[in-house]
């Protein structure tokens, strides 16, 4: 018998643009998306609907065909989500990339996702253009996403994204058969999965609507909600809520281009924000700022704070809880890209101080397996947690072998996380990760990717990368164990080699250790537990 989430709720089976725009559920002129740094910049439901229809017409005029993948490369902005919806409305597939990526990384992501179009922040075009050209994407299929007067298009020959708005309006791509909502892909976000390089994960209309339904509709709250959106929009931790739930709910949502503690705290206090989602490094930063008199009471309006993407210790959780109002809850959630974000949570107004990540969402199932893959599902039994349910994605795009190893014959996704379910409370607790993924400030770093870069160094014979935990920073960092080709190679040279080729969060901030040999088993697999 599998573990099952309590309760049940009907999940709409339709295309996601109709789900948002077929019917207005609140005042259509009220601002929904607002720029936290300049609240005069805002977008209402009516404006969003018009823009999405214009983008659908413009992208089709530009040659987009059903199933074409469009890469959006930018920091957060109130128009980011509009572009996401416009891409889907045109029949395309949205793909987001980290603004910190190098050309090397962008080249890989564009290639494996089979991107055909690019919309990029002008500040990042120097890295994006070579990557796009390397994947056969011509400049007439690249647009500059300039949203502020201070930004200028740094590269000539590129159209501004608003050129896509000059082709009139077109109805969005509707699904003739509602059941196609369960098979038609709308987003291709990246996950490290359980092993290897970042993998493109395909989300359907149904996956994303299910995520919203199980998180929000199944758990209504007795107060008017306002949100602050500070997590990166390209990331699966933010995408379902930021791009889809926001306009469905109509709750005022204040967008930060990127997380800035002063702006975050000022916005929460000034606009009486009631809900936010964070990751442990953000929690730690807020704690350090709230020790000053200026911000000591800035969080009093918050009623719901959820923390995920990495474990949070109980001491830090208690410290943050003490900054909130007595009726506020600060709880942990658990999920992953492959579960469309959240899989377990503790709904308001229940609190938790035990370190639990919550209970399964309604309609979700879980089982526990041992190291041999045998089902050992039982309360209070530790093993690898596997998930099944409406939010679990179809799989990785164009990677049949990865799908075969990640999903079993019964449709369960092997999370790689070790945990157990408390038999009395039905709360879940995670103990460790089976997978080798390193979590740096909420971002996932695949050791294989960093190892692959280092193996191209002419003076490195062998290498293994592991995560080391920094207790002060409350995050892991990558550390490289290196077998040198010659003894003249120094730590700073190795660090610089990685820094020039990978994003900042993938750098070797955990240091470099030189050793005589990398421990491996008979099949050649690195024995990282010995490092």
Curated annotation (Swiss-Prot):
Induction field: Expression is under the control of the azaphilone cluster-specific transcription factor azaR.
Binding site for AMP: 188-199
Pfam families, A to Z: AMP-binding, AMP-binding_C
GO biological process, one term: secondary metabolic process
Entry EC no(s): 6.2.1.-
Ligase keyword on record: yes
InterPro entries: AMP-bd_C, AMP-bd_C_sf, AMP-dep_synth/lig_dom, ANL_N_sf
Top-level EC class as recorded in UniProt: ligase
Function, in words: Acyl-CoA ligase; part of the gene cluster that mediates the biosynthesis of azaphilones, a class of fungal metabolites characterized by a highly oxygenated pyrano-quinone bicyclic core and exhibiting a broad range of bioactivities. In the first step, the non-reducing polyketide synthase azaA forms the hexaketide precursor from successive condensations of five malonyl-CoA units, presumably with a simple acetyl-CoA starter unit. The reactive polyketide chain then undergoes a PT-mediated C2-C7 cyclization to afford the aromatic ring and is eventually released as an aldehyde through the R-domain.
Name of the protein in question: Acyl-CoA ligase azaF
Organism of origin: Aspergillus niger (strain ATCC 1015 / CBS 113.46 / FGSC A1144 / LSHB Ac4 / NCTC 3858a / NRRL 328 / USDA 3528.7)
């Amino acid at each position: 018998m599998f573990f099952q989430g309590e309760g049940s709720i009907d999940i709409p089976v339709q295309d996601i643009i109709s789900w948002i725009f077929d019917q207005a559920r609140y005042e259509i002129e009220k601002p929904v998306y607002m720029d936290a740094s300049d609240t005069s910049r805002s977008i209402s439901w009516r404006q969003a609907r018009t823009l999405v229809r214009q983008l659908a017409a413009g992208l089709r005029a530009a040659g987009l065909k059903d199933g074409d993948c469009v890469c959006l490369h930018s920091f957060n902005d109130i128009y980011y989500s509009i572009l996401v919806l416009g891409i889907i409305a045109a029949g395309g597939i949205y793909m987001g990339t980290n603004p910190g990526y190098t050309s090397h990384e962008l080249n890989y992501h564009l290639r494996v996702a089979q991107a055909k179009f690019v919309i990029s922040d002008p500040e990042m075009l120097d890295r994006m253009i070579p990557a796009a050209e390397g994947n056969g994407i011509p400049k007439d299929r690249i647009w500059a996403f300039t949203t502020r007067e201070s930004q200028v298009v740094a590269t000539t020959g590129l159209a501004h994204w608003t050129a896509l708005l000059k082709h009139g309006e077109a109805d969005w791509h509707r699904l003739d058969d509602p059941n196609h909502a369960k098979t038609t892909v709308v987003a291709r976000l990246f996950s490290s999965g359980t092993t290897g390089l970042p993998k493109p994960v395909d989300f359907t209309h149904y996956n994303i609507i299910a995520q919203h339904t199980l998180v929000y509709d199944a758990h209504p709250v007795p107060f008017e909600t306002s949100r602050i959106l500070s997590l990166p929009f390209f990331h699966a931790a933010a995408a379902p809520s930021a791009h889809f739930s926001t306009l469905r709910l109509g709750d005022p949502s204040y967008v930060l281009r990127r997380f800035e503690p002063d702006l975050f705290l000022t916005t929460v206090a000034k606009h009486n924000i009631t809900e936010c989602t964070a990751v442990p490094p953000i929690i730690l930063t807020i704690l350090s700022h709230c020790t000053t008199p200026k911000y000591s009471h800035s969080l009093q309006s918050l009623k719901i704070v959820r923390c995920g993407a990495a474990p949070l210790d109980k001491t830090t959780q208690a410290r943050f809880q003490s900054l909130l109002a007595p009726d506020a809850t600060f709880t942990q959630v658990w999920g992953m890209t492959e579960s469309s974000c959240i899989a377990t949570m503790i709904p308001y107004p229940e609190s938790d101080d035990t370190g639990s990540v919550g209970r399964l969402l309604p309609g979700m199932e879980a089982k526990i397996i041992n190291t041999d893959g045998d089902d050992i599902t039982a309360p209070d039994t530790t093993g690898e947690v596997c998930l099944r349910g409406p939010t679990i994605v179809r799989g990785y795009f164009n990677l049949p072998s990865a799908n075969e190893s990640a999903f079993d014959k019964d449709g369960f996704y092997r999370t790689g996380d070790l945990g157990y379910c408390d038999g009395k409370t039905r709360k879940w607790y995670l103990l460790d990760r089976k997978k080798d993924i390193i979590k740096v400030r909420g971002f996932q770093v695949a050791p294989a990717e960093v190892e692959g870069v280092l193996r191209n160094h002419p003076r490195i014979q062998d290498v293994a990368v592991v995560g080391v935990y920094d207790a002060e920073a409350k995050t892991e960092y990558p550390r490289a164990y290196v077998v040198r080709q010659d003894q003249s190679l120094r730590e700073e040279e190795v660090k610089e080699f990685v820094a020039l080729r990978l994003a900042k969060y993938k750098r070797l901030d955990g240091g470099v250790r030189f050793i005589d040999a990398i421990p491996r088993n008979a099949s050649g697999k690195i024995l990282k537990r010995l490092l």
